[in-house]
């Protein structure tokens, strides 16, 4: 079944409720319609996630269709993406939005946390209300600041912040996706509220090979080059994009397979040094 097309029919603002109901009741009768495909520029296959990326998309699609059929039952989809910085969490959120024909409303901690007492809580409530009114997927990006375990809170506002987020998330009937690099500091009650929790891990060999080909297509990398990069177990898609951007400013005669491999390895060494410096443990 072409879920992408089906969901566009359900959410279309040009269709009446009776037309939408017909699509729900007869989801396989799509042959007479023009079917559109989603943006294919984002390659899900390179991601290393605890749940396969395409399966995540299908889970969301299934929930939307089933929610439309079941009146009065649980509504809303709550998703948590956690793991390494630059591992594709935000990009997958955009892909999901594209897959179901909806837009993202993106929020981050800097835009939510306020200086005045109660301001942050109001901003959280406002974000959920805005997503509801605009019928968008709500993405809270890197929101470690208000996911913190309440038992460790040193200020009362930290507790009320988590409480407000829990309240708003539970009553929200749309899709909310949250991303964090630090799941280990998250409030336990917060974690239990998510329907889908996905860990984003370092790239495997095949992911490294695929991204080398995508970002540096004119170079011929050896299997040893690929193994050198992936053995650190910290390489992410963001590393390749960052290095590709930097190479614009270089004399291209100096850019070789060896240089690219060395630079990517240096990035991983810097990550490892950073973890040791601030006392992180695996």
What are these regions (language model features)?
Residues 45-224:
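Walker A/P-loop NTP-binding motif of AAA+ ATPase domains
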């Amino acid at each position: 079944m072409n879920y992408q097309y089906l969901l566009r029919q359900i959410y279309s603002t040009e269709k009446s409720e009776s037309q939408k109901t017909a699509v729900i009741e007869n989801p396989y009768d799509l042959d007479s319609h023009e079917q559109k495909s989603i943006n294919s520029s984002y390659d899900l296959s390179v991601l290393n996630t605890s749940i396969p990326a395409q399966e995540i998309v299908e889970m969301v699609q299934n929930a939307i269709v089933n929610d439309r059929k079941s009146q009065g039952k649980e509504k809303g989809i709550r998703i948590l993406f956690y793991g390494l910085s630059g591992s594709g969490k935000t990009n997958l959120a955009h892909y999901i939005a594209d897959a179901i024909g909806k837009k993202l409303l993106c929020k981050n901690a800097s835009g939510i946390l306020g200086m005045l007492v109660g301001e942050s809580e109001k901003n959280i409530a406002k974000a959920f209300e805005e997503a509801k009114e605009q019928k968008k997927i709500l993405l809270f990006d890197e929101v470690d600041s208000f996911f913190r375990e309440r038992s460790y809170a040193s200020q009362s506002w930290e507790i009320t912040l988590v409480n407000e987020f829990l309240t708003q998330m539970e009553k929200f009937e749309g899709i909310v996706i949250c991303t964090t690099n630090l799941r280990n500091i998250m409030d336990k009650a917060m974690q239990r509220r998510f329907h889908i929790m996905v860990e984003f891990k370092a790239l495997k060999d095949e992911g490294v090979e695929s991204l080398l080909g995508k970002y540096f297509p004119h170079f011929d990398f050896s299997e040893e080059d690929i193994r050198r990069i992936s053995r650190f177990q910290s390489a992410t898609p963001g590393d390749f994009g960052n290095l590709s951007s930097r190479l614009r400013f270089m004399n291209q005669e100096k850019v070789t397979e060896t240089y690219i491999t060395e630079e990517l390895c240096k990035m991983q060494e810097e990550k490892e040094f950073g973890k040791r410096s601030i006392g992180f443990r695996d």
